[in-house]
């Protein structure tokens, strides 16, 4: 299935690229989420007319993500949780908890943007957490977990 990308897609291509993908990936992900359109003559012409508009929208998204990353870089979030004597938490701190704490401190962050590659936080301490704001923009936030 040949598609024209309407925005940058990780591990696939950039805006305007004509790519060949498996039918399921195109039908179930790229087309329904508006990330691509079918590559035919009519859609190619329509895309070329809208190219400047789409590039401006992509640049706006990236600049917005960069400004949020600058705000996050100087931010340190403290999360209080109940813990045992040795610092082991009763429960865990996940992406949802971190996103809520960041939003409460003034920077809007969705839970899908928070990356915890080693799984949830289960110990009291300081952690550097990656926040993936855009395909080209990633920020690191210091999260301090303290016992209640």
Curated annotation (Swiss-Prot):
A single GO BP: translation
What keywords were assigned to this record? Ribonucleoprotein, Ribosomal protein, RNA-binding, rRNA-binding
Q: Which domain of life is it from?
A: Bacteria
The protein's GO terms of the molecular function aspect are: rRNA binding; structural constituent of ribosome
The record's GO CC annotations read: ribonucleoprotein complex; ribosome
Classification via Pfam families = Ribosomal_L9_C, Ribosomal_L9_N
Show the PANTHER family listed in the entry.
50S RIBOSOMAL PROTEIN L9
- Family per record: Belongs to the bacterial ribosomal protein bL9 family.
Q: Which HAMAP family match?
A: Ribosomal_bL9
Protein name per its UniProtKB record:
Large ribosomal subunit protein bL9
Organism, by scientific name, is Pseudomonas putida (strain GB-1)
Gene label: rplI
């Amino acid at each position: 299935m040949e598609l024209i990308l309407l925005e940058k897609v990780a591990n696939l291509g950039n805006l305007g690229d004509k790519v060949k993908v498996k039918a399921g990936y195109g039908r179930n992900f790229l087309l329904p989420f508006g990330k691509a359109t079918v590559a035919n003559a009519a859609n190619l012409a329509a895309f070329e007319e809208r190219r400047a508009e789409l590039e401006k929208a992509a640049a706006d998204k990236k600049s917005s993500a960069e400004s949020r990353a600058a705000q996050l870089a100087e931010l340190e979030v403290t999360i209080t949780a109940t813990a045992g004597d040795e610092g082991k938490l009763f429960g865990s701190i996940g992406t949802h908890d971190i996103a809520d704490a960041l939003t409460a401190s003034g920077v809007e962050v969705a839970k899908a943007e928070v990356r915890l590659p080693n799984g949830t936080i289960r110990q009291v301490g300081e952690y550097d957490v990656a926040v993936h704001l855009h395909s080209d923009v990633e920020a690191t936030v210091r999260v301090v977990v303290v016992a209640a």
